[in-house]
Amino acid sequence: MMIISSQILLLFGFKLFFETRGEDDIVELLCKIGQTQIPSSDPLPILRGSGSGGREENTPLPPPLPHQNLFIQEDEMSSWPHHPLRQDYLCSELYASTPAPHPQSSVSLAPPPPKPPSSAPYGQIIAPRSAPRIQGTEEARGSTSRKRSRAAEMHNLAERRRREKINERMKTLQQLIPRCNKSTKVSMLEDVIEYVKSLEMQINQFMPHMAMGMNQPPAYIPFPSQAHMAGVGPSYPPPRYPFPNIQTFDPSRVWLQSPQPNPVSNQPQMNPYGQFVGHHQMQQSLPPPLQVILSQYPLCLFLCSNK
């Protein structure tokens, strides 16, 4: 009877301890204590603790009664060595009595599974792929800039050559114009225009006289300033360059040859009209009346060009 009462008190103490500590602590404590024996005829009651459900967690624990002694006396413990504990039976009964944990708690307490390699951070996957694209873009920009710089260099070189050619032509033109010492291109071109106009007036003045013949006096053609004042003819500016002094042929005069022999006459002489470059080509390009005039009197053109 005393053994039964001690076992009841022990179970009641385990129950209180189980309610305060939990199932895991009770199982660990019972496994460590190997001096209690529970008969196989009396099954252990199912103990429910804080892990069995959420309703018992909120209910307060009943206070212990003052007449109940939770500590085991020495006389009660003296009978424990005569009854060896079957530890496998006690542990199996306690493990069987514990309810299975809720699946939600196991899911919540379980560590998160490792992420697959496909769900790696964005930078670790995109960075290697974007590197060749960035490199290709930089190469394309570099090639485009090189092409633009090369095109600019070619354009500058062409402009430099064109300016050099223009300067050379302007120098040549300045040498052809007499008394032209202008430095600017505009003033030099003005002198060229005036010189060409004066040459045109000289040709218009002397060509009719040569076409009619040398035995007739030249027709009187007033200067542009006089013709403009008289109201006859177009208004031309006065020529800046003097007209060539050409002596007309007088048939009343008799030209006598000197009796002294000229030693230079026997030597071969150069044709004075050979200075005209492209003289025959120029005659072929002119109309027939001018070709006849220039073939008979090419000296006028020679004098006008030299002046």
From Swiss-Prot:
A GO cellular component annotation in the UniProt record: nucleus
Name of one Pfam family that matches: HLH
CDD domains reported in the protein's UniProt record: bHLH_AtPIF_like
InterPro entries: bHLH_ALC-like_plant (IPR031066), bHLH_dom (IPR011598), HLH_DNA-bd_sf (IPR036638), PIF1-like_bHLH (IPR047265)
Domain of life of the source: Eukaryota
Location(s), subcellular: Nucleus
Biased composition annotated in UniProt, kind: Pro residues: 110-119
Stretches for region Disordered: 41-68, 101-155
Residue ranges occupied by any bHLH domain in the UniProt entry: 150-199
Record key words, sorted: DNA-binding, Nucleus, Transcription, Transcription regulation
One GO molecular-function entry: DNA binding
Family assignment from sequence similarity: Belongs to the bHLH protein family.
Assembly, per entry: Homodimer.
Protein name (Swiss-Prot/TrEMBL): Transcription factor bHLH127
Organism encoding this protein: Arabidopsis thaliana (Mouse-ear cress)
